């Protein structure tokens, strides 16, 4: 099933490019920003397109509700987006998979764990296009989220303040 939506926020360079082509960004503009919470094969995820990820309030819409956040970016400022995705993995307490063009790099898969092991994959970029894969242990993430404590063997960090356990239980039921 394909699900389409108008982008909620366009980067300044995108708006500039559209204007040079005599186009307008996101017309017609929705009265309310929209994001999709998708449940597929018992995995809950949402997608953010590039500059949308920079809105902290909009990222917080899915706190406690996601297993994975997918971020599709096209931006040369990879450090800026790396910091945002690291924050999202910790604040939303979910995996974050970010894709960027191979020319810029910065594509990564992060998990909400200590910094030294939070990058499951990180691609710096270059001329060779490639596909890398990793396994995300959704079950282990949810089990760690359910427990109110962590032991020394846990790689998943403590839940952030305000984590909604009811939302976790609801997510696990479906």
List each model region and its residues.
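Active-site catalytic loop in hydrolytic enzyme cores
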Residues: 1-64, 83-84
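CN hydrolase (nitrilase-like) catalytic-core segments centered on the catalytic cysteine
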Residues: 44, 53-158
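C-terminal functional modules
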Residues: 165-174
